[in-house]
Amino acid sequence: MTMTPALNPVIAEHLAAVNAHDEDAIVATFAADALVNDAHREFWGTDAIRRWVAKEMVGDKVTVEVTEVTDHHGQTIVRGRYDGLFDRSNLPDELILTNYFTIRDAKIVTLIVIYNTPAY
C-alpha cells in the first residue's frame, strides 16, 4: 500500500488560497525572492509573482484539485486537476499539471508548473 505524504503546511495554505482566489494570501506563501516558472515563463520576486497571480490565477478563477503528492529529496511534487476560465486551446478536457515546490523557512522559494505528457 502506498501512502500519500501530507502536504507541507505552506503548500496546503497556498492551494487553499488559490482555490479561494485570494491574491494576498497566495502571494504571502512565497519568499520575497521566490521564483515561479509557469508555461516556460519566469516570475522572480513577489512583485512579479503578484502580477502573475492577479492575472492568471485569480483573474482566471483557477482551482486546483490535488490528485497526487510525492516528496522527492526535499522537493514536494503535487499533481493536480486544474480548472478555471483560462484559454483551453490545445489542452485536454481534464488538465493535470505537475507543481514542483521547494520550501525554505516555511515559504515557497521555487514553484515550477509543468504540463507533463507520458514519456512512452
PLM-predicted stretches and their roles:
Residues 1-29, 120:
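Short, low-complexity N-terminal intrinsically disordered segments enriched in polar/charged residues
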Residues 3, 50-120:
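A beta-strand edge to alpha-helix "cap/lid" segment located at domain peripheries
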Residues 13-16, 39, 59:
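Short, flexible active-site loop motifs that bind/organize anionic cofactors or intermediates
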Residues 19, 43, 78:
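Short glycine/serine/threonine-biased micro-segments
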Residues 24, 32, 109:
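Glycine-centered loop/turn positions within well-structured domains
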Residues 27, 46, 50-53:
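Short, well-structured alpha-helical segments
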Residues 33-44:
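A short gly/proline-enriched turn/hairpin at secondary-structure junctions
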